[in-house]
Each structure stands twice: as structure tokens, then as C-alpha cells.
């Protein structure tokens, strides 16, 4: 009972159990809607991953599948349109064709795909690992910090063979990892890293190296 005055009593109303979704609740959700960005050279693999997740989530009886808090859990497509066009000078820029605000983004890049080419000054150039890594950074820059989390899937770890210094040499792999983390990358997933200890360059960030032999 709640006292409204000395003479009158107001009986509290009983409400049915309900869930009120507020901005604070949404901010406390540990995950965001899934978004997959497959860069050039990794689009076929990205499509296969997307198709698998679409079918899996469609058949999955997730308890909160239709909950507004988990909006976007089940969709027909998780791929996000992203492009890296080049200017006549050979320079490039990253473009994302849709909103990625609040999404968990997974960027897939194959730095050893040499089949991709681009034209420069009338010559055809094959893309090097450096070109692929720069394109990855361009797409991350296009996200602009609006994604909830950024995860990079890089089957072959960029500059992984330059993991230690033998004389007056640059530590390219460590610098690349630190650069990605500074740009807002939360997790880096690779396969069979040349030396997994390179993760010491980013001890406070996620780094996963999957050994193919384990799954074979």
C-alpha cells in the first residue's frame, strides 16, 4: 500500500510482466548484429561463409531469435557491400555501401591472392600483400569507428615471416598488428601463424591462430 494522503489510500496497480528495451539495455548487450565484409580476392569464400550462416541460423531455434534486442540475428544476407576503387594515380579509397553502426564486423582478407590486378599508367599490376593490407586499412577507416566490434580474418598472417629481428631489420608483423589495433580492431584470426608469439606485440587484444592439423 502507498500512502497518498492521511485519509486516502492508493492501491498499486499490477502490471503484466514485460521487458522494456532502453538504450542502456542495448548498450549492455555484449554482441551486435553480424556483418561480413569480404575484400577483393576473398569474396568467394565470404559467400560460402555467408550461405552457411544463413542456413544455420534459419534452422536454429534460438530462444531470442525474435527478440527486439537481438534484431538482425536471422537475415537473408550478412554480406556488406564494400569496395576499394582506384584513382588514375594508382591510389585508392575504401567505400562501404550501407550502414554498419552497432554491428559486429568480420573482415576477410587474403593477402596472398596475386591473381587480382589493377591498371596503372597503362601497365597491369598484380596486387601484392602490401596492396591487400592497405585495402584492409582503407575499409576499416571507412567504418569510421561506428561498428560495435571489428574482427579481422586473415588466413595468411601479413608479414608473419618477419616476426623477429636478426640484425638491423624492421619488425613488420608486430607493427602491422599494432597498427590494426590502433585503428580499432578487437580480434585478429589467422591460420597456422609462422610464430604465434608475435601476439606479444598486442597483448591486450584478441589474437587467435588456428592450426589446420587440429581439424584434420
Language-model region placement:
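PRPP-associated nucleotide enzymes
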Residues: 1-216
Amino acid at each position: 500500500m502507498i500512502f497518498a494522503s492521511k485519509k486516502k489510500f492508493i492501491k498499486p496497480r499490477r502490471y503484466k510482466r514485460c521487458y522494456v528495451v532502453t538504450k542502456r539495455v542495448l548498450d549492455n548487450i555484449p554482441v551486435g548484429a553480424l556483418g561480413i565484409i569480404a575484400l577483393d580476392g576473398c569474396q568467394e569464400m565470404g559467400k560460402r561463409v555467408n550461405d552457411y550462416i544463413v542456413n544455420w541460423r534459419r534452422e536454429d531455434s534460438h530462444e531470442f531469435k525474435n527478440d527486439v534486442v537481438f534484431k538482425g540475428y536471422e537475415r537473408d544476407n550478412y554480406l556488406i557491400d564494400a569496395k576499394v576503387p582506384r584513382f588514375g594515380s594508382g591510389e585508392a579509397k575504401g567505400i562501404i555501401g550501407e550502414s554498419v553502426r552497432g554491428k559486429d564486423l568480420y573482415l576477410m582478407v587474403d593477402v596472398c591472392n596475386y591473381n587480382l590486378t589493377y591498371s596503372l599508367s597503362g601497365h597491369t599490376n598484380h596486387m601484392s600483400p602490401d596492396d591487400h593490407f592497405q585495402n584492409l586499412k582503407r575499409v576499416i577507416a571507412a567504418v569510421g569507428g561506428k561498428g560495435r566490434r571489428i574482427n579481422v580474418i586473415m588466413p595468411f598472417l601479413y608479414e608473419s615471416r618477419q616476426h623477429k629481428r636478426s640484425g638491423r631489420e624492421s619488425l613488420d608483423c608486430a607493427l602491422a598488428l599494432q597498427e590494426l589495433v590502433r585503428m580499432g580492431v578487437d580480434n585478429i584470426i589467422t591460420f597456422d601463424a609462422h610464430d604465434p608469439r608475435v601476439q606479444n606485440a598486442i597483448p591486450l587484444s584478441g589474437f587467435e591462430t588456428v592450426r589446420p592439423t587440429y581439424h584434420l
